[in-house]
Amino acid sequence: MSKLALRAASLAPTTFDADANTIEAVISTGADVQRAGYIERLPIGNADLRGIAGAPVLDAHRQDGVQRVLGVIEKAWKAGGEIRALIKLSSREDVAGIVRDIADGILRNLSIGYRVKTWADSTSSKGERVRTALAWSIHEASFVPIGADAGAVTRSIP
């Protein structure tokens, strides 16, 4: 079993639907991320989105209890070189403040938890080690204070 890795993205509240309690987010742009000792690449075209519907949306990747579940990914798709997701947020009282912060634009960043099935290693023109995911899948998304994929944003027009 491969190790669950984490990568971040951000979202804007413009697609928040209060009636449905949903928000649309770009959860990955495939941007390079500097890791310890290498550059990580998650090409969007190599992502397997089968089975992502129903994946949990967590509080900062915390998996220590069901109270950490803030919502669920209803669907995800590739478009314009991005992975986008429709997230259904919980209506539980204990997460109402978090949902309000999402709607108000206070909480904007998302991070994905993913597994890489196959890596390819190479060296950049600058001599840096590069690890490219040839096959990878998303297993959860989390709201986080700071994200690594700075180019990922929520779409203003769904």
Feature roles, as predicted:
Residues H61-A76:
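A surface-exposed loop-and-adjacent beta-strand signature within N-terminal beta-sandwich domains
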Residues G37-I39, D64-V66, T123-R129:
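Acidic Ser/Thr/Pro-rich low-complexity disordered segments
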Residues M1-A53:
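Polar/acidic, low-complexity leader/linker segments enriched in S/T/G and N/D
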Residues G30, A36-I39, N46, A55, ...:
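Generic secondary-structure boundary/loop-capping signal
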Residues A31-D32, Q63-G65, S91-E93, T118:
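Short, charged/polar surface micro-motifs in flexible loops or helix N-caps
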Residues A53-D64, L110:
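Short conserved beta-strand and strand-loop elements enriched in small hydrophobics
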Residues A8-D17, T22-A25, P56, E74-P158:
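Residue microenvironments linked to proteolytic maturation
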